[in-house]
Amino acid sequence: KKNTKAAVWTKYGEALVNAYEAPTGGIQPGWPRNLITERPSLTQPAEVNGQAVTKLVFADKNIYVDEAGNVVVVEVTSPITENALDKAVDAYKKAYEMDPKTEKDVVAALQKIVTNYTNDAINDYTFGNYAKASQAFEKAANPSLVAPLKELDGSALYNAGFTAALAKDYS
């Protein structure tokens, strides 16, 4: 009896999403710097998208703060596990296949994963990494096509194409 219950897969998916989100500490762009309670190991000037910022270096992330003192970008440098969101999508898909009654929880989880992929894409775009942004926007569109969500995310697809064009990737 190996992983025969949907609950095992939903818990696994939840653990993967939590592992993905943990390094950011919940910090989001737009937050004032004074809400960051952790002390950086290094503070240095940097530039993001042509804007002068301060780079706060931590063990697992870099946080870029603008001159007004607001977070511009949170860049995770040491994820807890690689491809956590991809694995989480697979786990939730498996949970739904095993028990369609998990639909409500699976839909909410997939929507959260889409948001995380979109945030990754926006970060990559902000840094001028258009090819990576395109891939992340494409990944944001993929979970929305998974049952039970099955909604075409036109914004993610448009942004994937737009950033691919910026990266001169016409394939």
Predicted regions and their residues:
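Solenoidal tandem-repeat scaffolds enriched in leucines and small polar residues
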Residues: 133-171
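Generic structural signal for well-ordered, non-membrane alpha-helices
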Residues: 13-15, 90, 135-138
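Short coil/linker segments at helix-helix boundaries
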Residues: 17-131, 144-155
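N-terminal Sec/ER secretory leader and immediately downstream segment
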Residues: 9-14, 26
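N-terminal targeting signals for Sec/Tat export/insertion, comprising classic cleavable signal peptides
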Residues: 1-8
